[in-house]
A protein has these predicted regions:
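Short, structured segments at the rim of ligand-binding sites
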Residues: 1-114
């Protein structure tokens, strides 16, 4: 990582900084997307194992999920979601429980294995 040290008085500093996406903010947003019937677009999505697992979990529930080469994720929830979250997917990451609130809000019933 580059580091810049600025000494003394300066008139102004300006520029652009690229911030990498964070898994810990992306997973709750993916889970919350279940609440929306329109498409949800997430940009700068980190392609780490938990994000891919959550993508597969959403697909298993009935969502359509696309990820572009520019790390933009499009989630579509036009059809009703299944009420049962597959144990195989939930058991590989703790973030699977994040879907509970969204599924309860959308369908008033949910089954999850813990």
């Amino acid at each position: 990582m580059k580091k810049y040290i600025i000494k003394g008085p300066t008139n102004s500093i300006s520029g652009t900084v690229n911030i990498n996406g964070a898994k810990n903010s992306c997973l709750p947003l993916m889970a919350a997307s279940i609440l929306f019937k329109d498409k949800v677009i997430l940009k700068n999505v980190p392609l780490v194992k938990d994000v891919i697992t959550m993508k597969n979990l959403l697909i298993s529930l009935g969502s359509k999920v696309e990820i572009s080469k520019t790390n933009k994720m499009i989630i579509k929830n036009s059809k009703p979601h299944k009420r049962r979250v597959p144990y195989k997917l939930v058991s590989t990451m703790r973030a699977g429980v994040l879907t509970m609130g969204s599924l309860l809000g959308r369908s008033q019933k949910k089954k999850i294995y813990v």
